């Protein structure tokens, strides 16, 4: 897996809309960015995925699954993990190449390579792999005999003495996450949602489900996406607003040896002497493998930055509403008023390191400064579940994940029997207890009120509602109306944005709402998971689903995708889905 790590990130991000090239950008990255990559491009290699697949094939073919220690099967978890990893690797091939050779036998002789294996597209790959994986649903990943929270150290980088560690269990991918991802790509939204729910209720580390993050903001000291400082009128002075959310700073997810929120990752070695290294940190301007002599700053940042946040991402971050409690001298309850600030979303800013250089400012993206290649985070999976719910027509459930998160409060009612969460339908509330049983009698204790956070609150402040027993200081009664981040309002704003951008007649049908919320989820994925290797696949998947829905004419998905990426000046017409794939080699 370490051999494919750099390619995974660059294939996923360079063709997306969240990074831009610089004077120092490698030509291979430039070619990916403008869709001119040929089979000579060093980041276009199906081989690195097939190498993983063949290793898995070999293990699966030769593993004796009847090995027991007493009544405990001591190998089945690793056997399942090999099948999940193989499916994940095929999923990446299906995303990047239109059709790929498919085989499940181990290739041990050169003569086997020339066999006429069937070439399958992504839907056929899912059809081949998913039925076998279904029998392993709800199975945990291997722990290799150590505590799931345990960190093993693997040496230190040359420029610092602090040891780098990794979590062995997080080097595997839960089978339900792979199944959910495959079904979502294939447009089987019900199966995708069921498997994501199974992951959260049967597999996920329970402490992760109750971890809260917020990019906690301090006025007039937070770097804006454009490199300047927030003006005085962007937010009231500190004594005029209240910190309404608690929890760990969101950027700690990407800190040294963190495991919270991380489901699966590829930890890279701290030095060449310790194993396989990665070039990803250096591409973003951080020389993780510098010697102490090469460290010219407090940390080994370099001036030759190859990738920066795109103007689109900076604009999205800066234009996102930030919500805060306003307090007044004569106000009885300082938590009655939630206001909108022009300060923007805090997540991008919390992973940007900035230093002055003369009259300009230099910015570095810090997500990779500890050489961890993230594959899945719980936050990512919640957003994929929101995407599936939305396409199932459960638009309110999708918004719940953005605004409030999943918690017992969803089932709460006032004395007169009316629900606390007024924007949820009775049908959705019932589905969350039965069909997608996050809040069934068996599972509801996994999601306590006090630790429920909507994903949007990670960076946008007081987007959530208040509820009895909740984390908010003003949570005496449940009130969905305090924060301006409301379902109807946000959908209306997004509909107007789409109408203006694409010149389409946006109506008030269910499909119009689904499309608008899908774009809201797309924005949230940008703010939450930027630079993690997902973006091209998110855009491509959503464009495909828009086309399949038939909304706004025959090829709205293609037009939507092409417009988002027009700033990259692609050399091909991205309205044509045939141009969405890399040349296979």
Residue ranges and their predicted role:
Residues 1-20, 573-585:
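Acidic, glycine-rich segments characteristic of secretory precursors and extracytoplasmic regions
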Residues 20-100, 116-127, 133-134, 138-140, ...:
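Conserved, well-structured interaction surfaces
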Residues 40, 201-418, 423-428, 463, ...:
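Elongated scaffold/linker segments in the mid-to-C-terminal portions of large proteins
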Residues 49, 154-167, 263, 267, ...:
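Long, intrinsically disordered, low-complexity segments
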